[in-house]
Design a protein with these regions (language model features):
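Flexible, acidic/Gly-rich N-terminal and inter-domain linker regions that tether
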Residues: 1-89
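Canonical Radical SAM [4Fe-4S] cluster-binding loop centered on the CxxxCxxC motif
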Residues: 84-121
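Short linear Ser/Thr-Pro motifs
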Residues: 58-60, 94-95, 108, 178, ...
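Conserved alpha-helical substructure of the radical SAM core
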Residues: 110-139
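Conserved AdoMet/S-adenosylmethionine-binding subsite of the radical SAM
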Residues: 130-139, 144-212
Length: 212
């Protein structure tokens, strides 16, 4: 809205743009026919809707689980999963390309950490599934590649935007962050006072067994 205001574009047009992207899954400005031609031209000249590129999609035999491989602008790739639950659709997103944690049972960490995903790249995984299914996404779990609490700021901002009623309106109570135990940011998340579920992926009751 602030960008539109700066360029003397009516405020309600920003809401229309958000609706096109996050609810109608229309990403080509020329297809946004509620906008006058001059605004569509201005958007095309000055703005970019950048989503991860869908590389492959795998669908389970029962059709209730879909896994996608997506590529970012720098050609790095991550996976995301859509699960159809009794209450609606849940998306599992990645938070990093690779991972630095070194958990021996996890394939994501084998090549080490390449980089953090941006806020837009995290949200983009959810938007792609919305576009594929044309269905509302009810819950999000940050349980794909990467340690979410090591990419704390981007993950939290992505969840806050997904919670925004104008964007996806997903309840914080329907969001889960999975961690292998990045303790400093566990406390930091607790201090946020948000009812986001924290899942601990420890796989053993003590470090000796876990490291074996």
């Amino acid at each position: 809205q602030s960008i539109f205001k700066t360029h003397n574009i009516q405020k309600f047009r920003a809401k229309q743009l958000i609706d096109y992207i996050y609810h109608r899954y229309i990403f080509d400005f020329e297809d946004m026919t509620q906008f006058p031609k001059d605004l569509r031209q201005w958007l095309g000249d000055n703005c970019v809707i950048s989503l991860p590129t869908l590389i492959t999609e795998s669908i389970a035999p029962d059709g209730k689980t879909r896994k996608i491989l997506v590529e970012m602008s720098d050609q790095s790739r991550v996976e995301a999963v859509l699960m159809e639950q009794h209450y609606g659709y849940s998306v599992c997103v990645s938070s990093q390309v690779g991972c630095a944690m070194g958990c021996v049972f996890c394939a994501s960490t084998q090549g080490g950490l390449y980089r953090d995903l941006t806020v837009a790249e995290i949200i983009g995984q959810v938007v792609i599934f919305g576009a594929l299914t044309k269905e509302e996404i009810h819950s999000v779990v940050v349980m794909g590649a990467g340690e979410p609490l090591q990419n704390y700021d981007n993950v939290l901002q992505a969840l806050q935007l997904l919670h925004d009623p104008m964007i996806c309106n997903i309840s914080y109570r329907k969001m889960t962050i999975s961690t292998c135990g990045w303790v400093p940011n566990i406390y930091k998340l607790a201090d946020e006072g948000l009812p986001i579920t924290l899942a601990l992926s420890l796989h053993a009751t003590n470090n000796e067994v876990r490291r074996s």
